[in-house]
Amino acid sequence: DREVWRTGFPRHDHLHSLLGRERDSILLAPTWDPEVSRALECDPDAVGLLSALYRPWLELAAGLTQAGHRTVLFAHPKLVLHAPEWFRALGVPAVTGHDLPETLVRSWAVVSDRSSVLDEGMIAGCVGIVWDPRGRPDTDRYRARHEAIGAIGADTSAQVHQAVGDVVAGRVTAPEDLLLLDAGACARLTALLRRDMI
């Protein structure tokens, strides 16, 4: 809904203040899996589930790094909470929620299966690339919605590599009509709340 984009979210005010940084990385943002999170909560040794969940993303990160791109992995805070050592040992730089805004404004593109991090990236000037290595049916709806506002859909990791190359070379750019215009989301939301108060 364009009205939501125009109003903004309070956290976007901070994101806006960071815009204009030099872009030097590709952010991979797989969505979290609540079943994996619950399993880790019950059994901290169930890190094999994390390995299975992140394997295609780590393979993509390795390929992009080999192609000369600085790659950063978004690690969902709920998963990091249960297995911090696993994420520290990845060999790929990983960020959680706290460092995410700085990473977004420095990223050329955000690659995601369906994480809201892709939305945040697109309003921060990143090109959105939708790729689901598990090919879940509901990702098609997510992909279609995001392609309608300028994201790139990718069916294979090779297509992700091609899209990243196009973005870094400047052949594909982020849609300008999605960029944050100001840091006034808090003020707008407060005004709307005051208007509707009884």
Question: What are the residue ranges of the model-derived segments?
Answer:
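Catalytic binding pocket for nucleotide-activated donors in carbohydrate/polymer assembly enzymes
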Residues: 85-88, 116-181
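Conserved catalytic-core segment of nucleotide-activated headgroup transferases in glycan assembly
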Residues: 7-86, 154, 187
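Short, acidic/turn-prone active-site loops that include or flank metal/cofactor-
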Residues: 9-11, 97-101, 133-137
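C-terminal alpha-helical cap of glycosyltransferases
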Residues: 181-198
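Hydrophobic/aromatic beta-strand patches that form the interior of the parallel beta-sheet core
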Residues: 5, 27, 72, 93, ...
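Donor nucleotide-activated moiety binding/catalytic core segment of transferases
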Residues: 77-119, 123
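Short, surface-exposed amphipathic charged segments that create phosphate/polyanion-binding patches used
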Residues: 17-28, 108-114, 166-170
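A short, active-site helix/loop in glycosyltransferases that binds the activated sugar's phosphate group
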Residues: 1-2
